[in-house]
A protein has these predicted regions:
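Short, charged, intrinsically disordered terminal tails
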Residues: 148-149
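A conserved beta-turn-beta hairpin within the catalytic core of GNAT-like acetyltransferases
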Residues: 27-31
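NUDIX/MutT-family hydrolases
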Residues: 95-99, 106-138
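Short, acidic/hydrophobic/Gly-rich beta-strand patch recurrent on exposed beta strands
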Residues: 22-25
């Protein structure tokens, strides 16, 4: 088994009206999150990782991807550490935004996610279980204004 690379992406899928798509994890019902996933060896760069994960987890391919130039480092939960090389305890997460024209029904991979919700950014921020995901969503209004709705 190849070990996972301890580098990942978090992609906040949103509309210009600041509605955010959240996905409910299949292995942890009740845990809601944005699109996430690990970099793979054949990904050309982190943007490629983000686009691959978007396609795999939601089927979404039409939108504007923006690198937020935001990086988080967090401890990998003990129950997931066997997926990584011995001694790896932390992951580096790179945050992206993905602007879509309207709320779109995602095509979920049932092995990964069992439900989806579009919520106003404040509600999405409260619903997500991950502190880094909450922080990213909290920055959405400023990023949309700063970049003219292309966050």
């Amino acid at each position: 088994m190849a070990f996972k690379i301890p580098e990942s992406v978090l992609v906040v899928v949103h509309t210009a009206d600041l509605d955010v798509l959240l996905l409910e994890r299949a292995v942890q019902p009740g845990f809601w999150q944005s699109v996430t996933g690990s970099r793979e060896p054949d990904d050309a760069d982190l943007a490629a990782t983000a686009l691959r994960e978007l396609k795999e987890e939601t089927g979404l391919a039409v939108g504007t991807l923006t690198d937020w130039c935001l990086t988080n480092r967090y401890e990998i939960w003990p129950q997931w550490r066997a997926r990584y090389a011995t001694g790896v305890t932390h992951n580096v997460e790179h945050v992206f935004g993905f602007l879509v024209d309207r709320q779109t029904v995602a095509t979920l991979d049932p092995a990964e996610h069992i439900a989806q919700l579009w919520l106003p950014w404040q509600e999405a921020m409260r619903k997500t279980f991950s502190p880094t995901n909450r922080d990213a969503i909290s920055q959405l209004p400023g990023r949309v204004l700063e970049r003219g709705s292309t966050a």
